[in-house]
Amino acid sequence: MEIFDYDNVLLLPRKCRVRSRSECDTSVRLGERSFRIPVVPANMKTVVDEKICAWMAQNGYFYVMHRFDLDNVRFVRDMQARGCYASISLGVQPPDHDTVEQLAAQRITPEYITIDIAHGHADSVQEMINRIKTRLPRAFVIAGNVATPEAVIDLENWGADATKVGVGPGKVCITRLKTGFGTGGWQLSALKWCARVATRPIIADGGIRSHGDIAKSIRFGASMVMVGALLAGHEESPGQTVEEGSERFKEYYGSASPFNKGEYKHVEGRRILEPIKGPLAHTLVEMEQDLQSSISYAGGKKLMDIRKVNYVILGGDNAVLM
């Protein structure tokens, strides 16, 4: 098995088929909806809040609301009352099962439910998928996070409509340092490995450091990527604003950090400061334009044409052409 990550792979151009990059279609379908770009902000308290989620839904983007200190039933009701789709996160603890029962009792079905735990290849995830599929059968279920083909196969067999691949590669995640496990340093290889067996969409979660990494994720089998650091640090970001001299930053921390947990227990995340980048909308438009350029370099017109290109693995004098 080849081991590589985003920083030591480059994609190879093919003959361009468009006159303008603006002709290239970056949209992707997930469930019953299409979205402008294959990018979803990480479901973290310092990346998304209710206002950002509503704006994204109204402007053609996919979102997943975080699951911390939130009344999910009220959130779903409010989003759907606005004419927006509802996309929520759940864990696998008794309160999460209670939320499913409350939604079913009130005949409210969120369009998307993400089962979001650090080690998603677990009996508890199988139980939660089964509960959701039984009580809220119309919901599109995303389950994760996982790191192996075996896990993807199991989650699909258990009923997941999509899987989230990535254990610990994020900028504020320290899972590999604390536990010795994860996909940090080889996330792109893990994605390729998992995509070979997947029959449903994969969301690559973590390790994205530049817009070009989004195109690389699509090439190696992702339908969408979940991005934290690149979409934190905006004017609208819910993280606390910190000023140091003449510079302004936004607080950004992992869901398994003590800053999110409120206690130092089973910590696998840390806190950093992200320079404020300006409005979120500007970054999303730039991502779309950069993906259009990627599609044009791939010799295509649609997003998935990126999957047709060859690539090189960089390694000093020993670059490998694939």
From Swiss-Prot:
Which NCBIfam families does the UniProt record give?
GMP_reduct_2, PRK05458.1
Q: Give the protein family.
A: Belongs to the IMPDH/GMPR family. GuaC type 2 subfamily.
Residues annotated as binding NADP(+) are 202-225
Kindly state which reaction or reactions the protein catalyses: IMP + NH4(+) + NADP(+) = GMP + NADPH + 2 H(+)
The molecule here is called GMP reductase
Q: What does this protein do?
A: Catalyzes the irreversible NADPH-dependent deamination of GMP to IMP. It functions in the conversion of nucleobase, nucleoside and nucleotide derivatives of G to A nucleotides, and in maintaining the intracellular balance of A and G nucleotides.
What EC number(s) does this enzyme carry?
1.7.1.7
Active site residues according to the UniProt entry:
173
Can you name the source organism? Verminephrobacter eiseniae (strain EF01-2)
- List the coiled-coil residues: none
Source superkingdom: Bacteria
